[in-house]
Amino acid sequence: MDDLQSQNLSMDMTDSPPTLANNRLENRMAQLITTEAWNINSTDLVKKALVTVPAPSILNPPAESQSGMALKVAATVLQPLCLGESPVVMPIHMQVEGSSAPELNPNGNATYVMTTQGPVQLPVVLEQHVFQHLNSPLVLPQEAPCSSNAIHNNLFQGAEDSEAQPQLLDLRIPSQPQEPALPFEAVLQNLFPTQGSLGPPPCQPPPGYAPVPPQPFNSPLSPLVPPATLLVPYPVIVPLPVPVPIPIPVPVPQSTESKFSPTFPKPPSSFGLHSFKGTQTTLEKDELKPLDILQSKEYFQLSRHTVIKMGSENEALDLSMKSVPWLKAGEASPPVFQEDAALDLSLAAHRKAEAPPETLYNNSGSADIQGHTILEKLSSGMEMPFAPAKCSEASAMMESHSSNSNGTEMVSQPSHPGSELKAENNIEILSESQAAKVIVSVEDAVPAIFCGKIKGLSGVSTKNFSFKREDSVLQGYDINSQGEESLGNAEPLRKPIKNRSIKLKKVNSQEIHMLPIKKQRLATFFPRK
């Protein structure tokens, strides 16, 4: 190296370093990129890097800068470099301790390299992204971060000393014919003609030094689109579960009048308990013994409408209202009714109907034949639709229906003595079916539904089963109402009813055993009998 410096010392004194660099560039412009550049050995490149230093393109006094663009120096940090109108991020890898940042020479006298995109100046020497852009298979090793501390000191002493620049240039000039990678000394000169003074790293990495492989977007020669590996894989949007308010029905407090049945409105006052008792008392005391057909029809209409209204509006209150006429009808005086009120409420488990009032008429009027005839007419009239008929029409229809109903009763229940018992049973059956249509209560209506299933499955006829079921359910009412009567002719009437009820209980139990599947479901209703 001393020989090289001594040979070229006189020429360095006469010619300026940019002039020598331009001469070398013009002489070897055709030989910049040869086959040796692609097949160069990495070890030779490192050895030559210790000698080759791009002095003209990198090291110049700060006074010669023309204030174009500045690059701040930082170690291992990517610094933005404004080139033209678009900022370009260029890697800065080296930093020399205790030295100020020298600046580039923007006068265009740096060396050029011919690439596929035209002549390019190389202010940053041999970065790996340049080779990637030029499709070079050369992989530079990451050795020799800088040549040595002595080289750095010589470089920056030469920047201050007038004789140091020719020395550094002499180091580069003789090795240029042997350096195949030297054409990459000046990059981006033609691409960025408005390049001003740059603050490059104090120690620019030699051609043999390859820093950490920069990302493709760091290079101004690389495509503008970043690689897919640098993009965010996918935006993660996790919808959080938002609690949806669910409306919960809050029961509205009912008034004292309708507290028994919160789902139905209160019944009208015309069908209240008081008015019903007063009407029944008047019918019983005034014209119960003569038992006129007109009075019977009026009472039938009253009881029918009352039952329908109560069944559709207020179920819980319906039980108490229907039980009052029965007990009051079964007894002879109001004080006895006071005692039996509790008994009637206890028997509320049975299915109730408006039959006991008619049974009352039958029992109280059984002394004479006229009472039984009128009762038969009334019972047969209950089979008809609930249209109020005149006295003459009602009597005619009732007589015709009574004969048919009596014949049916004899067939289904041959053990009953007399037409009066048949008429009474017919009244009970019809009133029971009528109450079932109205649905007296939830407690009383459910057994009727299950009994209908049993009736259809067990093979029992509809007529026979309806009679048996109603007689067995109403046996308590028949016995109680008849036992309280003061008439002597009711005794022979009560005994057949009692025997018949016991017999029909057995039949019902047999029918239940015929269906073991339904027996367990009906167990909650029948033990109350």
Curated annotation (Swiss-Prot):
InterPro entries: RAI2/SOBP
Species per Swiss-Prot/TrEMBL record: Mus musculus
Induction statement: By retinoic acid.
Ranges where the record places region Disordered: 1-21, 400-419
Polar residues bias locations: 407-416
Lineage per the UniProt record: Eukaryota, Metazoa, Chordata, Craniata, Vertebrata
Coiled coil stretches, renumbered: none
Domain of life: Eukaryota
Protein name: Retinoic acid-induced protein 2
Span of the signal peptide: none
